[in-house]
């Protein structure tokens, strides 16, 4: 049978975040695979106790003997965040540029995994030979250091996987987009381009970090009191802008938040941020007058445990905020975070603190391509096939329309699990791989249907009842049950307790407890009775636990 070239997204197609993409080449049954990116997304309030969500890698785990490498485009969490959680199931080589390598080493260190013999550091614009794939890293621009597109060469043709990108003429830190090489790649012929869809609805160009710096300097020059800047820690160009503006306005700067320190250290380790003023410890910054300090902190999305939220609640041990200070949100609002972020901003304004954000000043540009950026990339690459990824369904469908406007002969719409045959023949979805999500519950990966998640949702919505019942040797109830309940809206506690005790006694009297099976039957009946009683009295059907104790 003839060799074939396949593409299969397991995450990031039909959603923003959690990127995981597979490429395969070879005869059916003899494919060799590479994985591009292995990211996470973050849970919302509908999943209490869950922090991270990542793609279910089961499809490729079953083929791990033929997985010859994980190739990482850049260091954002939605592209590398799952690597330390999922790699132990895959145990293959990893390829990344220096900055990304530093950050993933930290992730494995936290898991006590020695990745040294598997991690391959690729220099910027370097080449990786993973037969039958020859992968060339192409420097792009984005909202993080060292973003890369991948030119993936196979005997069947060339694929350009863009990763996350935009066209920034003045990125301030790191290299400019390698437009000359991209044009050469396009002129040599590209079978398919796998492309970022995030900002397909945004007109014009994405904008430059240099323009943000000019605006930030103008804003900060007019402020007289304490300044707190909240930004994504991973945006090192924005970090450098904060340092630059602090120095130009005669202020010192202090980093607040674990992620800020981690990214600053990694950037320094890779040779960046060498010419900025030295940050001072927040404990030292307390002794500096309000007019002479800038704090750069985490928490731009209103995260409950991040530095900015603690500062706003006056619970941070080192950073104090007061009336007439200013908080600058140099970031966009990630969809889903609006409520908690606006609550934070309202609290700040209520306390007499000025809030500056992209809603009222120019303090942020996106790291993803607007339509003019996309147009330019399509003109450079001229792909025969376009496959939109990194977007919700509405983004990807609009991107398909855009690709048609750019005269791409074969745009292909995909969702997670779709297997696209790029060669031979016209590119199209021809099969489906199993795909899904895994949830990090504590230190354990679970599926959404897991009992722990179901129980926690139930507890969160309906509360909890526990009844402990003493059973005599003759099988009857000894005294009244011991009751505990939480999260149930009870007006008259005494009335509720007495009523619940009566319901338990009524059920228990009807049972003879001579065997384990009879005990199990009683427990089931008591659970039903307790939930029914609570539903009638409070409208809640709580999670219920029954303990039978023989005396």
For the regions a protein language model found, what residue spans apply to each?
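C-terminal tails and terminal domains of large nucleic-acid-associated
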Residues: 515-551
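Solvent-exposed loop and beta-edge segments used for protein-protein assembly and interaction
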Residues: 15, 144, 289, 459-461, ...
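Flexible glycine-/small-residue-rich
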Residues: 139, 154, 297-299, 469-473, ...
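His/Asp/Glu-rich metal-coordinating catalytic cores
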Residues: 1-71, 76-287, 306-320, 339-341
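Hard-cation-handling environments
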Residues: 201-330, 334-359, 363-515, 523, ...
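Conserved hydrophobic residues forming the short capping helix/wall of the S-adenosyl-L-methionine
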Residues: 108, 403, 534
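Broad gene-expression machinery/nucleic-acid interaction feature
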Residues: 132, 147-149, 464-466, 544-546
């Amino acid at each position: 049978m003839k060799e074939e070239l396949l593409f299969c997204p397991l995450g990031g197609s039909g959603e923003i975040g959690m990127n995981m993409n597979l490429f395969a080449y070879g005869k059916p049954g003899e494919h060799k695979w590479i994985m591009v990116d292995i990211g996470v997304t973050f849970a919302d309030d509908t999943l209490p106790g869950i922090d991270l969500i990542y793609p279910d890698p089961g499809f490729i785990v079953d083929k791990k003997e033929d997985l010859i490498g994980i190739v990482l485009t850049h260091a954002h969490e939605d592209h590398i965040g799952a690597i330390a959680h999922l790699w132990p199931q895959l145990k293959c080589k990893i390829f990344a540029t220096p900055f990304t390598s530093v950050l993933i080493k930290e992730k494995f260190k936290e898991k006590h995994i020695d990745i040294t013999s598997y991690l391959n550091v690729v220099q910027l614009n370097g080449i990786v030979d993973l037969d039958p794939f020859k992968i060339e890293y192409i420097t792009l621009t984005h909202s993080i250091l060292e973003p890369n597109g991948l030119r993936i060469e196979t005997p069947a043709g060339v694929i350009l996987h863009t990763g996350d990108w935009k066209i920034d003429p003045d990125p301030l830190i790191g290299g400019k987009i390698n437009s000359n090489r991209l044009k050469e790649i396009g002129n040599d012929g590209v079978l398919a381009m796998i492309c970022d869809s995030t900002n397909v609805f945004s007109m014009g160009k994405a904008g430059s970090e240099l323009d943000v710096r000019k605006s930030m300097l103008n804003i900060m020059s007019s402020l007289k009191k304490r300044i707190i800047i909240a930004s994504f820690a991973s945006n090192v160009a924005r970090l450098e802008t904060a340092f630059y503006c602090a120095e130009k306005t005669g202020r010192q700067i202090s980093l607040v938040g674990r992620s800020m320190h981690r990214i600053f250290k990694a950037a320094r380790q890779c040779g960046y941020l060498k010419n900025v003023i030295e940050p001072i410890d927040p404990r030292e910054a307390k002794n500096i007058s309000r007019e002479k300090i800038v704090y750069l902190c985490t928490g731009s999305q209103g995260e409950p445990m991040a530095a900015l939220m603690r500062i706003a609640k006056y619970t941070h041990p080192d950073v104090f905020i007061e009336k007439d200070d200013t908080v600058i949100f140099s970031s966009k609002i990630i969809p889903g975070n609006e409520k908690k972020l606006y609550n934070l901003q309202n609290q700040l304004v209520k306390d007499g603190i000025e809030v500056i954000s992209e809603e009222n000043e120019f303090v942020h540009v996106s790291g993803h391509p607007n339509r003019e950026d996309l147009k330019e990339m399509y003109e450079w690459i001229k792909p025969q096939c376009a496959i939109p990824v990194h977007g919700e369904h509405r983004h990807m469908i609009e991107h398909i329309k855009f690709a048609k406007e750019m005269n791409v002969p074969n745009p292909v719409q995909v969702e997670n699990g779709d297997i696209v045959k790029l060669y031979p023949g016209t590119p199209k979805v021809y099969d489906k791989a199993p795909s899904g999500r895994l949830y990090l519950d504590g230190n354990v990966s679970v599926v959404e249907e897991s009992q722990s998640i179901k129980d926690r949702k139930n507890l969160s919505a309906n509360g909890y009842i526990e009844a402990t019942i003493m059973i005599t040797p003759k099988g009857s109830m000894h005294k009244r049950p011991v009751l505990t309940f939480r999260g149930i809206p009870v007006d008259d506690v005494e009335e509720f307790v007495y009523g619940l005790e009566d319901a338990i006694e009524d059920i228990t009297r009807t049972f003879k407890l001579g065997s384990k099976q009879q005990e199990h039957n009683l427990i089931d009946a008591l659970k039903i009775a307790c939930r029914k009683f609570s539903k009638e009295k409070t409208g809640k059907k709580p999670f219920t636990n029954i303990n039978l104790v023989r005396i």
